[in-house]
């Protein structure tokens, strides 16, 4: 039997395809970025959020350059489809992250869509926003496979110790 690694080979593609083509992908990313700047928290599929995250971080880096920087203004003008959000980028979001280098966003997985296609969903938000905090997922470590195996081992050892104590206390009398 021969194994194929065709799924792992990207053939020069370094990004997700997300839509009907390159132009559709850019429009989708622009709309998602505009929504993120406007609301500071959005919900989308995991693939879209993961792809958009780098662009959201880079947009803040350009915003930190200031509104007098020509390249920063061009990037903001291109990526934000609603032009009333450009001042928010430079006057609200960029000063919030002025002393920070990178890691401006938080991405959390949320339950999959139920009624449609069961797509893996996520929430992305800018850190330090005024929205109520999202509940961080709590993983119950007692339910991991390793911990379940250790628990079973402990129970077996405890049971064996009880059995050995019980057998040592019962004295067998010789039969005559």
Curated annotation (Swiss-Prot):
Component of the mitochondrial ribosome large subunit (39S) which comprises a 16S rRNA and about 50 distinct proteins. It comes from the Eukaryota. It is found in: Mitochondrion. GO terms for biological process: translation. One of its GO terms (molecular function) is structural constituent of ribosome. NCBIfam families: L17 (TIGR00059). This is Large ribosomal subunit protein bL17m. It comes from Rattus norvegicus (Rat). Residues 1-8 form a transit peptide. Belongs to the bacterial ribosomal protein bL17 family. Keywords: Mitochondrion, Ribonucleoprotein, Ribosomal protein, Transit peptide.
